[in-house]
Amino acid sequence: MNLMIDLTIPDTISAMFGQPCCRKRVGRHRSLSLGFGEKVFHTKPMKDPFYGEWEIGTYSAPWRVIQDNLLVCGSLEDVESIDELDAQIQIIEFGNISSVEMISCFDLRVILENNTYVEFLQVATGEDELVHIFGPNSLYCEYAINAGWKIGRSDVPWTQD
């Protein structure tokens, strides 16, 4: 791993701060998606008929929700189904997003206004992103431990570095 990776959170996501949580969903393989800001409706056959104007989440990294210094839900919960884990996340009141911070070069924390945190945890080596952020105008950001932050567009192919 490159020890010189810049951990600075991209300024391009600062417009997300202060936005209310409008969507939360646990998906396949215990992925997590949190939507913030305005609802952006789509016609895809999905549980939610909309995304958030801003979406932050992970496809494969472990995550946990901490509220008032108590662990209230996590991706490794002993549940019978993804629907059961999704039901747990639906009852949590997330409120507005305050900020995003790197806890270390491995882990990221989403800070919400009501003493709630969502943490994404890197627990294996590899090239998969820890977290991704979709924003307005096809903005796409991702963080991976081997590359740091990358910023681009979600509507065009990315070139290999």
Kindly label every feature range from the protein language model.
Residues M1-D161:
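Surface-exposed, interaction-prone regions used to assemble/regulate multi-protein complexes
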